Amino acid sequence: MSKEKFERLKPHVNVGTIGHVDHGKTTLTAAICTVLAKVYGGDAKDFASIDNAPEERERGITISTSHVEYDTPARHYAHVDCPGHADYVKNMITGAAQMDGGILVVAATDGPMPQTREHILLGRQVGIPYIIVFMNKCDMVDDEELLELVEMEVRELLSEYDFPGDDCPVIMGSALGALNGEAQWEEKIIELAEALDNYIPEPERAIDLPFILPIEDVFSIQGRGTVVTGRVEQGIVRVGEEVAIIGIKETTTTTCTGVEMFRKLLDEGRAGENVGVLLRGTKRDDVERGQVLAKPGSITPHTTFTSEIYVLSKDEGGRHTPFFKGYRPQFYFRTTDVTGTIELPEGVEMVMPGDNIAMTVTLIAPIAMDEGLRFAIREGGRTVGAGVVATIIA
């Protein structure tokens, strides 16, 4: 049984396939699983089992996603593949499947297509940090020059959306050829795996990031002071450290004088743990749900930002009618709703249920935020959309 234990010690990296419909994303996913299982051990998966993606619900939104896993000698990968374009849009915006890197699949026979562009743009908006290109169906193109032309187009498209188009690895292969066991194409899958290992840096673990705890509840304990409770989102809070209380009101700083979990006193609270944090000299009314406790200076409160939004369809329990400029819903960040106004892109008059769109949001109260923060859009407690902070304006 020692082998199983060893596997868990490898760094864990989340990736996924993106790209235009029918360019071979699912075939490539199957090919990676099959070839790597053959070479490094692991479970092979066939096309049908990946394509038959189960439906999941993330914040009330129905998304079909396939999750597969594979290993290289250096790492363990969790890989997501979505059957339909709408699933990708929802997946990226809700962050249902966070990606440390994306594999952009482009058919050499077609070159970049509309969804190729849309997925690159979405990747930029939602913060996929690295993209590797797999040019697929190269066995169907005889002309070297055509392959070079497609590669150039893809690199230019990546650069247009602020990815380092000149430096992204581009692998030319045939997913179907590799799946059918043709040696020259299997080699290209190994080359892709090496690019994943070398080009996507090991992600920072939540525990190594600066401390953040979204406040869920506030209690006053006689003779001891004020306790806030919540789940530590990232980092570590230690007794005796300074912490900032950020969002909704003016930012204040105080000292953590105690951490407790299940009524036991601890020296520290770590990412993923539900804890109570005792705050020195803080009154019950100084703190409220929706604020965050954080390492001072690590995160700042903002009211205005651009975002990428997915609006739930009627079938998903969303609105039945479009909304227009001047729409004022609640934006649910972490643990609380804040009212905000929206500004639609130039030339867009209305937004229909089922659409995805970039918009600027202005909140009536500041919220601790960073680019990449996910939120829900609600009307009277009902979720009508999901979004992600793309860039902070003020």
Curated annotation (Swiss-Prot):
Keyword Ion transport: no
Main location: cytoplasm
Binding site for Mg(2+): 26
tr-type G domain residues: 10-204
Region (G1): 19-26
UniProt cross-references to CDD domains, sorted A to Z: EF_Tu (cd01884), EFTU_II (cd03697), EFTU_III (cd03707)
E.C. number(s) listed in UniProt: 3.6.5.3
InterPro entries membership: EF-Tu_GTP-bd (IPR041709), EF-Tu_GTPase (IPR050055), EFTu-like_2 (IPR004161), EFTU_2 (IPR033720), G_TR_CS (IPR031157), P-loop_NTPase (IPR027417), Small_GTP-bd (IPR005225), T_Tr_GTP-bd_dom (IPR000795)
Keywords annotated in UniProt: Cytoplasm, Elongation factor, GTP-binding, Hydrolase, Magnesium, Metal-binding, Nucleotide-binding, Protein biosynthesis
Entry-linked Gene3D superfamilies: P-loop containing nucleotide triphosphate hydrolases, Translation factors
Region entry G5, spans: 174-176
Region (G3) location: 81-84
The protein's role, per its UniProt record: GTP hydrolase that promotes the GTP-dependent binding of aminoacyl-tRNA to the A-site of ribosomes during protein biosynthesis.
Assembly, per entry: Monomer.
Protein name: Elongation factor Tu 1
The organism of origin for this protein: Photobacterium profundum (strain SS9)
Gene: tuf1
